[in-house]
């Protein structure tokens, strides 16, 4: 069976995963998590990060033992040796990828409409069409574009942090803790925040 050529370097692969984490986790999910966890938003992201870290270490160990692209589909195929189960896993992965793409496209609409008042369906269709063309261009070219976008995203976050540092401090840390949400809200927000850490799975799938 012919194999795909390895065209991604380590920096491109790292930016490929980081782009998903920053784009989805910060620019799309931040408001949703803050709406549930309120002042405890940081705790929700910390909890989600700890859970995702365990999964990430598992993916890192498995991908080092089986250095082939495929991610979870490959791991299921090796573990159970059942072709039908691998196909089921592939369809599950495709479904979750479609849902992830829909979430990110929906989040992009809010930013786009700040500048141009187009309808949401039109923006989503155009964005999906552009992303399809980029993906069809090639994995290396897509990763380079993602790296550029990721640098812009990180630059935007640094700018926001710099501007926010100049603002007067309105609440003390004690007041923030007193206004924190309960454990139930933090846990619910952590489930949503977990989505922000899907980048490691993308990295394993294309490595």
Please annotate each region the language model reported.
Residues 9, 23, 62, 203-206:
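Hydrophobic/aromatic residues within transmembrane alpha-helices of membrane transport systems
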Residues 17, 31-33, 73, 77-79, ...:
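Helix-loop junctions at the membrane interface of multi-pass solute transporters
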Residues 3-5, 42, 117-122, 148-207:
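Helix-loop-helix junctions that connect adjacent transmembrane segments
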Residues 17, 45, 89-90, 128, ...:
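Residue-level recognition of transmembrane alpha-helices
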Residues 48-51, 128-135, 154-164:
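Hydrophobic core segments of alpha-helical transmembrane domains in multi-pass membrane transport
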């Amino acid at each position: 069976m012919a194999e795909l050529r390895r065209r991604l370097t380590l920096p491109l692969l790292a930016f490929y995963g980081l782009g998903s984490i920053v784009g989805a986790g910060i620019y799309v999910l931040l408001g949703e998590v803050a709406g549930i966890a309120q002042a405890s938003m940081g705790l929700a992201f910390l909890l989600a990060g700890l859970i995702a870290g365990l999964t990430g270490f598992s993916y890192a160990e498995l991908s080092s033992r089986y250095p082939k692209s495929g991610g979870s589909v490959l791991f299921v195929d090796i573990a159970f040796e059942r072709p039908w189960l691998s196909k089921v896993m592939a369809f599950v992965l495709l479904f979750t990828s479609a849902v992830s793409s829909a979430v990110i496209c929906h989040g992009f609409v809010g930013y786009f409409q700040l500048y141009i008042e187009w309808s949401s369906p039109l923006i989503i269709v155009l964005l999906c069409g552009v992303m399809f063309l980029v993906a069809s261009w090639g994995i290396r070219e897509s990763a380079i574009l993602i790296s550029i976008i990721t640098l812009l995203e990180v630059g935007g976050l640094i700018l926001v942090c710099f501007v926010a540092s100049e603002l007067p401090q309105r609440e003390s840390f004690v007041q923030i803790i007193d206004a924190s949400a309960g454990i139930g809200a933090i846990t619910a927000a952590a489930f949503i925040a977990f989505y922000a850490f899907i980048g490691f799975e993308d990295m394993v799938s294309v490595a």
